[in-house]
Design a protein with these regions (language model features):
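Beta-propeller-forming repeat regions
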Residues: 1-318
């Protein structure tokens, strides 16, 4: 058991490791193929593209066409756009247009089916219903290999090989359902074992990792109010963990807010979403990606996350 009190306000050893700086990051680092630096804008060799006209809602990187070079895959509200860094410029090499009624929420790049070509995995909703899908490069074009998955999908990669996780949309609240590992069965993604993460978290909220190499794997999450929380692996519900008296599952909660996003989606008529303070929210958020990496090569994982400062606040309360 940890040597610190569960849920205490002071810093635990895990928290000290996770948050060496309370100033957040200057840039969103999507996965280990991007710049690795605690302060990326001051790092020698840092590169920034020209301002893009599109409003990107998600981004990941990988060799999605099998040519040995990484592509940057982005999504807008409806479209998938693929870029490549060529010299000092960012060149758009492919656009996959979507439909106006299908809202794209997140994108991941990972070889889940094990054929050597990473899939482009999209979480999406259509008229308030989850309808995710995956694309793969075949015969010179991007083809759907999986369609209409009635789950939110996300890739976790912190502790080793990429792992696809999925979560069915709840009937009363969108994220009140268990999260499962998804595996490839030869034709589609299939639900496998349950992930031990607090019930009520969404697939967009958390990572699993050993922040301390000698410690256990923990759940690191950003809650609805943008506070960082560290949990033991558990299947207990958020409501039972977040009690006035505290709980052993909640190892630590930050004093400062991190994250921050304008990526929201509409719910079906009659459905509402309750945040950690039980306020009813009309539009749940898709959190900006958390990741972990040993930035300074000291054998311990560092958390890499965004701290956005916005004047809009949380404006979607009912």
């Amino acid at each position: 058991a940890p040597a610190y009190a569960a849920g205490q306000a002071g810093r635990s050893p895990i928290a000290e490791q996770a948050l060496r700086s309370r100033q957040g990051t200057y840039t969103s680092i999507i996965n280990p193929d991007f710049i690795m630096a605690p302060q990326a804008l001051t790092r020698k060799g840092f590169w920034m593209s020209a301002r893009q006209d599109e409003e990107f809602r998600g981004m990941d990187i990988g060799d999605v066409d099998g040519d040995g070079r990484n592509e940057i895959v982005t999504i807008t509200f409806t479209d998938i756009m693929i870029y490549r860094k060529e010299g000092k410029t960012l060149k758009k090499i492919h656009t996959i247009p979507g439909k106006s009624y299908v809202q794209l929420l997140s994108v991941d790049v990972a070889d889940i089916n094990g054929n050597g070509i990473p899939e482009i995995i999209i979480s999406a909703v259509s008229q308030g219903i989850a309808g995710s899908f995956a694309l793969e490069h075949k015969n010179g074009k991007y083809e759907r290999i999986v369609s209409d998955v009635r789950m939110f999908l996300r890739v976790l990669r912190a502790s080793g090989a990429p792992m696809l996780i999925g979560q069915q949309m709840g009937t009363i609240e969108p994220f009140q359902s268990p999260i499962y590992r998804m595996v490839w069965d030869g034709k589609k993604y299939r639900q496998d074992s349950r992930i031990r993460a607090p019930l009520g978290l969404s697939v967009f909220d958390f990572i699993l990792d050993k922040l301390d190499p000698s410690g256990p794997e923990v759940v690191v999450a950003i809650d609805d109010l943008d506070y960082l929380r560290v949990y033991e692996k558990t299947e207990r519900s958020i409501e039972k963990i977040h009690t006035v008296m505290g709980s052993k599952e909640l190892l630590w909660k930050s004093d400062d807010q991190y994250g921050g996003t304008t990526n929201y989606f509409d719910l079906p008529s009659g459905m509402k979403y309750s945040n950690v303070t039980n306020e009813k929210i009309e539009k749940p958020a898709v959190n900006i990606r958390l990741t972990s990496y040993d930035v300074d090569k000291d054998g311990r994982k560092d958390l890499i996350l965004v701290k956005n400062i916005s004047s809009t606040g949380r404006v979607f309360k009912s």
